[in-house]
Amino acid sequence: SYTLRALKSGESTDISGLYADWAEALEWQSGQLSIQYNSTDGTGWIGWYDGETQWCLSAGDGADAPLVNTAYSIMQTLGYDVDVAPEGASDVVYSAEPRDGLAVASCAFTLDGVRWTYSMAATSQVELPFQDISGLPDYAVTEDAQILWCPAVISYDESGAGKITWFDVAPGLVYSLSADNSAGRDALLDMANRLFTPAQGEVG
């Protein structure tokens, strides 16, 4: 079961009413929303704060869908612009997990028979080389690339499976985009440019 709460507030705050030693405790940004996620084996809560209102969705035992994905559906219903999947995408799933010390928020979707995963994480590391948050090994071919003004690394193989990672230094955000098959270098670059919305707006 789920419980949804809301509170007018001057700052982000925990309104879940739940207290535990959580296995996962993550925070990240999605557009203008500050998001907090605390979970153990799928039970826990996710909160989002828009500068005026704190929302919180909590899940108990037996919740019938992943908590993060359910919360993103509610955010969209409430009118928040958090949908990063392109038009025509299907099987869209939102998730969050700790990875190499960072809180990685991801959106997986299927488009034209290819399964894509787009991820983002905030980092305090500003020097190169930047962190790879894809969770995937390098493929047969690895090259330097660029997404807008951001340094990028692209890696792929003959089947079209691959990944591209990039770093936007001003807001301190690292990104990754991966494809399971039939994509290749050009498709990875095209999709990355299509999905990437700079946190600071267009620059230069």
Annotate each predicted stretch with a short phrase.
Residues S1-G51, D81-L173:
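Short, solvent-exposed recognition patches
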Residues G51-V84, P171-G204:
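Surface-exposed amphipathic alpha-helical segments
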